Amino acid sequence: MKPILGLVILLSGTVAAQAQATRVYSDAGNIVIERGGNSTKLTTSEMDLDPVLSPNGAFAVYTRQGRGRSPRTYEFNQTCPTEPRPDQLRRINVDGSGDQLLLTGRKGEPERQLCDFRSKQFSADGRRLYFLTPAWASSGALHVYDLRAGEEHFLMPAKGLLVLSFCPNKYKDHLVVLSRRNFLLGGSYDWYWLYDPTGKKELGPLGQFNNAEDMIRQARGFWCAEKP
């Protein structure tokens, strides 16, 4: 899932800036919060990765890898492991309290299996959390978790994701999804497509970009530049 890495790094920095210079990160498998130049360890399992800070800066959501301290690399077509333990999606308050389990990884069909919980991104109000999981040979699966209802469901195949939570215009919380499509007479191509926040309505193609960073610059400089 290497195409996602640059996008995750950029978005982590964006969320941190919005939350008054507060940022969360993983260090030696533990979740750490940094505020005002001071760092505090929130977890101590040595198995925790890929945290993302909520829009209001009150809590973080992270992955606890079920394979413990061993190095973890997921490919798109990987079957989600449940031994020795399944991965977990967890939430913890920024003061270290309230560490709780949100989702447990599971095996299943590509659109149903859960693990990794990569490229986590919130909606603007912090209610919905979008993430990617391994699924098919050429694509991951996009899921959404409703933090109020405690419900998760599959949205669509996806190789990359950007939630336009920072948009001040009509595209606020819309989804930019990198999808693989097939040409009519053979072959395939990877383009970005725009969806409504539910992921149920495709609004149209956004085109091809050399990398995720170029796509994000386009989103901030053009798609989300106009005010309501």
Predicted regions and their residues:
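Sec-dependent N-terminal signal peptides
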Residues: 4-13
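Blade-terminus and WD-like Trp-Asp/Gly-His loop motifs, strongest in beta-propeller folds
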Residues: 18, 51-60, 120-128, 165-174, ...
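An edge-strand/N-cap motif at the start of beta-rich repeat modules
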Residues: 18-40
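Short, conserved, GDST-rich strand-edge loop motifs in beta-rich repeat architectures
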Residues: 23, 65-85, 134, 179-187
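Residue position within the beta-strands of beta-propeller blades
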Residues: 25-26, 59-63, 129-132, 175-179
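A short loop-to-beta-strand structural motif that recurs across blades of beta-propeller domains
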Residues: 30-32, 88-90, 141-143, 191-193
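Multi-bladed beta-propeller domains
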Residues: 34-47, 91-116, 145-164, 196-219
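N-terminal, post-signal-peptide region of Sec/Tat-exported proteins
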Residues: 37-72
